């Protein structure tokens, strides 16, 4: 049911891979929107469903961060930790942001909600502002400059680890999806790397594709 409800468009998508030996384990891969610094990247998450689910939240780990020791986002630690109040890994400002067990009102939290929160809220256009206490300000040039600089770092990490490395060492279970994704986006990725003057990465991409 979850896999059939996930977004699948020309610009972004989520793919689901169930562990055939253990129903409590699965992966999902996010291809973020192209208006974000994560464009064209393939980001994989490991999920464990605990015995007490849905009374307690699932355990989610960002495989792409963990394997490359790179922090893609204030919510995605280099160790793989996914920091979200919905997962109980961050203390949210209100009870509504936290995991809600099933109830008679039918307002309990769901696994689909977790996946979509990561897809839409974590992989945002300006991830620097995901850090609590950082607020957008048109008038504050220093803050805006820091956000732009952060985006450049995210772009570099995405190219190195979520594009090039995914072509070199595709995540198990998503090999075919990754291959098709980059084949379909070949010209767009090439143009993107050219615009960023990433000559070495462009040559590597052309060799791998």
Regions found by a protein language model. Give the residues of each.
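N-terminal leader/pro-regions and domain N-caps
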Residues: 1-26
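Proline-anchored loop/turn motifs at beta-strand termini and strand-loop-strand connectors
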Residues: 47-54
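Short, solvent-exposed loop/turn segments at the edges of secondary structure
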Residues: 23, 40, 55, 77-79
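N-terminal BTB/POZ boundary and linker segment
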Residues: 21-23, 28, 32-35, 45
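Short, solvent-exposed secondary-structure capping/transition elements
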Residues: 39, 54-58, 126-132
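Domain-scale recognition of soluble eukaryotic interaction modules
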Residues: 1, 62-209
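Residues in well-ordered beta-strands of folded domains
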Residues: 17, 29-31, 61-63, 85
């Amino acid at each position: 049911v979850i896999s059939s409800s996930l977004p699948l468009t020309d610009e972004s998508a989520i793919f689901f891979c169930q562990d055939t030996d253990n129903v409590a384990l699965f992966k999902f891969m996010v291809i973020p929107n192209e208006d974000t610094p994560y464009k064209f990247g393939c980001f994989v998450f490991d999920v464990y469903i605990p015995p007490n689910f849905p009374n307690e939240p699932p355990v989610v780990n960002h495989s792409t961060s963990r394997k490359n020791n790179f922090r893609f986002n204030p919510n995605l630690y280099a160790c793989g930790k996914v920091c979200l109040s919905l997962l109980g890994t961050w203390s949210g400002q209100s009870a509504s942001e936290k995991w809600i067990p099933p109830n008679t009102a039918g307002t309990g939290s769901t696994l689909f909600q977790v996946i979509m929160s990561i897809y839409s809220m974590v992989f945002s256009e300006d991830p620097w502002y995901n850090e609590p206490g950082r607020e957008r300000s048109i008038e504050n040039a220093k803050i805006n400059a820091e956000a732009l600089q952060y985006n450049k770092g995210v772009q570099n990490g995405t190219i190195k680890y979520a594009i090039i490395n995914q072509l070199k060492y595709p995540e198990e279970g998503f090999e075919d999806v990754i291959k098709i994704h980059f084949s379909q986006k070949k010209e767009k990725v090439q143009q993107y790397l050219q615009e960023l003057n990433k000559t070495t990465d462009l040559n590597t991409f052309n060799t791998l594709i």
